[in-house]
Amino acid sequence: MSNIRLIISDIDGTILTSNHQVDEQLIEVMPELEKANIPFVLASARSPLGMQPIAHKLGLHDNPIACYNGALVLEGDRTIIQHPVDKAEIQELLNYLSTYYPSVSVNIYSGKDWITNELDKWSQLEGSITGESPIIKELQDTISDSEPPIHKLLLIDEPEVIQDLHQKLLSMDFPQTAFYLSKDNYLEVTAKHVSKEHALLEVAKYYDLPLEEVMTIGDNFNDSPMLALAGLGIAMGNAPEGVKETANLVTASNDEHGVAQAITEHVLN
């Protein structure tokens, strides 16, 4: 048995095949991890509702899940870690968008809720991808301090609009807020220090384990910092070269049972 006592894994392009199905071989490996008392924790930009069915399919029960890239970590329905955005800065952002970028679709995520002010073509498309339905509500109503914390915003429009907006926001004064592109037309907005790397540090601390005893698995550039930081960072075979360079090892692709193979070879072996 290796010295790995905790596994943190990305979802899309990692444990899901190109057909968006959970890898069957990985499902078969899960009981062996449970028997060895090695938690398997999912970390993704997805919302809780986008992650829980996958966790359920893997039989993860109440293992923590790091949602919104670690802005919210849930154990069952219990919040164990959260990093909400600064509502004063979000108010400023909404004012700026309504004045200069009125066409941008603004989507707010608070806990399990997805909130938008109208079902435009972008939110309809996002709903068809995630299988979720938004709550239609005035966005200003979500910003008041009496309302629940906001964990993420997603801004969607044509690529040239979003990329122009991204550059503008980076030059503005938002000290508590981070902006990054997750697709060429998706701009994610979170609290400043939210990242999968930070989630790795917090989840390892939650389990009281040193980083040397943690294995991380991922396929994309937002996974690279957690691959570099963990005791054993595994890049998927389908990852870009730049991601593979940050990892200790490269496994097979997401369509060739890469995660199951990595666990079998480096954890259960």
Regions from the PLM with identified roles:
Residues 32, 96-98, 168-171, 242:
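Alpha-helical scaffold elements within enzyme catalytic domains, especially in hydrolases
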Residues 58-61, 69, 172-175, 229-230, ...:
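Short, structured coil segments at secondary-structure junctions
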Residues 37-41, 61-63, 151-152, 212-213, ...:
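Short active-site oxyanion
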Residues 26, 51-55, 165, 169, ...:
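Hydrophobic packing residues within well-ordered alpha-helices of enzyme cores
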Residues 21-123:
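Active-site phosphate-binding/coordination module
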Residues 2-6, 23, 188-269:
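Mg2+-dependent phosphoryl-transfer enzymes with acidic/Ser/Thr/Gly-rich catalytic loops
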